Amino acid sequence: MFYTTVGKIIKELNLECLTEISNIEERKIKDMNLNRPALQLMGFFEYFDEQRVQIIGISEMAYLKTMTKTQRRNAIEKLFQRDIPCVIITSNQEPFDEFLEFSKKYGIPLLRTSEVTTRFMTNLSTFLTHELAPRITRHGTLVNVYGEGVLMLGESGVGKSETALELVKRGHILVADDAVEIRKVSEKTLVGEAPEIIRHLIEIRGIGILDVKNLFGVGCVKDSERIDLVIQLETWKTDKEYERLGLHDQYIEILGIKVPTLVIPVRPGRNLAIIVEVAAMNNRQKKMGYNAAKALTERLQRQMSRNGNE
C-alpha cells in the first residue's frame, strides 16, 4: 500500500498549520479520495471513511454557524474523534475555537489554504493521485517524441540511451534513462518519470554520465510523461520473423493496462532514432483513425476485385 504524508502535502500545496501536532510530518495519507464532511457534521457517520482528508469549505462553515454553541462543539468533536489524517479549511476562513481545541486534544492536524474549495480539491486530488498510484520500476528509457511518450525497453547495451541521445539532438525530449518509474494514475493512463536521483541524466558508454538539462537546455527534458507506446529493442535474430506489414497490433500489459508495443530488431547500420520517430508518428496516426497497413490491404482487395470482374 502506497502512502504520502501530511507533511508532504503541506510543503507541496503551501498549507498553513493552525495547530502544532508532534507527528505531523509522519502522519500517513493512504486514500486519494477526499471528503467534505457535511453529513458527518449532522451526525451521520455510516459509511464514513476515516482514511480520507477532510475538507471544510464555505458551505460547511456556514452550516456550523447555524448551530448553537453546544451543537457546534459536539459536531466538531465527533469529527476529530475519528482517526482522520487531517482537516483542511479552505478560502482562508477563520476556524471556530472548537476546531483548534479538538485538533490539539486528539492530535489531528488542522490546516488552512487561501484557495477556494473546488480549485484546492482539484489540486490536492491531482497530487494524491500521483503519490498514491500503483507503480513499478522498469529498466528502460522514456522519451517524448512528437508528443508521444515512447518507452524503450531492451537488454543492457542494446542502444536505448544512444537512441535517446540522438532523439534529443533531433529536438525531442528526454524524460528518464536507465530506470523508469511507471505509475497507474487512472484505469487507462500510465505515467513514467525518472527517480529523482538520476533525473535528467543519461549514461553513454565510453563517455559516462551526461546532464542533458545542462548540455542541451531545459527544453530538452521533462519530469514526467504519459506512456503511449512501448518499443522493445533487441539484437537482430536471423531465425526470427519480424513484423513487416503492421496489420496486427501488439500490446504489452503494464500494471493491468495494455499499451501498444513494437519489437524493433537492432543491427549495425540501422538508424534507430529515425525508426523511433516514425513509429511515434505512426502510432499517433493510428489513434487518429488511419492505419497504413489496413489501407494497403483494402487497396489490394479493391484491385483484386476489379481484376476479377474483368
Curated annotation (Swiss-Prot):
Catalytic center residues: H139, K160, D178 (proton acceptor), R244
Residues that, per the record, bind ATP: G154, E155, S156, G157, V158, G159, K160, S161
| Single GO molecular function | protein serine/threonine/tyrosine kinase activity
Q: Which reaction does it catalyse?
A: [HPr protein]-L-serine + ATP = [HPr protein]-O-phospho-L-serine + ADP + H(+); [HPr protein]-O-phospho-L-serine + phosphate + H(+) = [HPr protein]-L-serine + diphosphate
Give the record's keywords alphabetically. ATP-binding, Carbohydrate metabolism, Kinase, Magnesium, Metal-binding, Multifunctional enzyme, Nucleotide-binding, Serine/threonine-protein kinase, Transferase
| Region of interest (Important for the catalytic mechanism of both phosphorylation and dephosphorylation), ranges | 202-211
Q: What is its EC number?
A: 2.7.11.-, 2.7.4.-
Q: Where does Mg(2+) bind?
A: S161, E203
Which co-factor is required? Answer: Mg(2+)
Enzymatic class: transferase
Which domain of life does this protein belong to? Bacteria
- Single Gene Ontology BP annotation: regulation of carbohydrate metabolic process
**What SUPFAM superfamilies is this protein classified in?**
HprK N-terminal domain-like, PEP carboxykinase-like
Region called Important for the catalytic mechanism of dephosphorylation, residue ranges: 265-270
**Chain's role:** Catalyzes the ATP- as well as the pyrophosphate-dependent phosphorylation of a specific serine residue in HPr, a phosphocarrier protein of the phosphoenolpyruvate-dependent sugar phosphotransferase system (PTS). HprK/P also catalyzes the pyrophosphate-producing, inorganic phosphate-dependent dephosphorylation (phosphorolysis) of seryl-phosphorylated HPr (P-Ser-HPr).
**Quaternary structure note:** Homohexamer.
For domains, the record's comment is: The Walker A ATP-binding motif also binds Pi and PPi.
Family under the similarity heading: Belongs to the HPrK/P family.
Which PANTHER family does the UniProt entry name for this protein? HPR KINASE_PHOSPHORYLASE, PROTEIN YJDM-RELATED
NCBIfam families xref list? hpr-ser (TIGR00679)
* Additional free-text comment from the UniProt record: Both phosphorylation and phosphorolysis are carried out by the same active site and suggest a common mechanism for both reactions.
Name of the molecule in the record: HPr kinase/phosphorylase
